[in-house]
Amino acid sequence: MVSLSQDRMKQIEKRFEIIESQMAQNPNAETYVKLASEYAELQQIVTPIRTLNALYKEVTELEAMANTTQIDADMYALAQEELVLLRQKIEQLEQEIQILLLPKDIADEKSAIIEIRAGTGGSEAALFAGDLFRMYERYANAHKWKVEVVSLSDSEVGGYKEIIATISGKGVFSKLKFESGVHRVQRVPETETSGRIHTSAATVAVLPEAEEIDIEIRPEDIRIDTMRASGAGGQHVNTTDSAVRITHIPTGIMVVQAEKSQHQNRARALQILRSRLFDIERQKAESERSASRKTQVGSGDRSERIRTYNFPQGRVTDHRINLTLYKLDRIMEGDLDELINPLISNHQTALLTEINDNA
């Protein structure tokens, strides 16, 4: 493990004290909001740093006492036991602080756009896409995040050929960003009379919800077409002339929205386009910073098979970290923390390893 830089910890404490002093000088409202935001972020690191420094001091004092000639054997043994416990606390706290000091994903605190599309498997894939959406919706509700469907294309037998939704709340993307990829399901369809297990799939894409300040879309870089909604399914097909298609000319990315309000369609299509462009820039920056981490929790490639849901066995397997849980019912009800938290931990471990290798 990389040893913590005492100089860096002192710099963080010094910056925290400066911010604290500036906040006490009654700045204007705009400045105060900026200072308060930085103060809250630094406080999460400064508090454990100060606890760690207190533990360092305690160890130094205890070691000095244990090394005196005046201490008896029993007191020496007690001191050694206490030192073991203190060093364990220090090791744990140092690791927590290292994680807090890891490079931040600029999108982690953002809301997210989730896109779920039925893949191979026909109607069963569409039903599974619906199951996945309800799973994420329940997970969001448990965290008191707001879920809003942006567009959907129904399947004739239930479920969705495609559904796009925003999930709004602080830190949504940090929790859901490792959900992108191919999700495979193995189960017996209700229409299967012989009891044969079918394999189907759905793709999930999770994007950070970008704001206008995050990425600039120049008017000359987009082409906006209005048209009659028609074609591949959906409850609003052939009911409106308000469908909007926005094409980003430099990248060729195309977004179509076909709800009833043309104004709303344009705004939502721009929102999705902005988020896709922002995600491209974010992933490009991440790739340039380091390619070594991509093997740890997967590349985020939408075509990568990341997870299998086996209904007959009640089993879920995440292939990126070789994690298998026999809690399928709970997971489909939105109890995802036992899947999501290990993925986050694995990512953090990979970052620490990378820093260690480059030290």
UniProtKB/Swiss-Prot annotation:
Q: Which GO terms describe its cellular component?
A: cytoplasm
Tell me which species this is from.
Bartonella bacilliformis (strain ATCC 35685 / KC583 / Herrer 020/F12,63)
Q: Describe its PTM?
A: Methylated by PrmC. Methylation increases the termination efficiency of RF1.
Similarity comment: Belongs to the prokaryotic/mitochondrial release factor family.
Does Zinc count among this protein's keywords?
A: no
Alphabetized, the UniProt keywords read: Cytoplasm, Methylation, Protein biosynthesis
Q: Does the keyword Methyltransferase apply?
A: no
Record-given protein name: Peptide chain release factor 1
Q: Tell me, what does this protein do in biology?
A: Peptide chain release factor 1 directs the termination of translation in response to the peptide chain termination codons UAG and UAA.
Region: Disordered; residue ranges are: 283-305
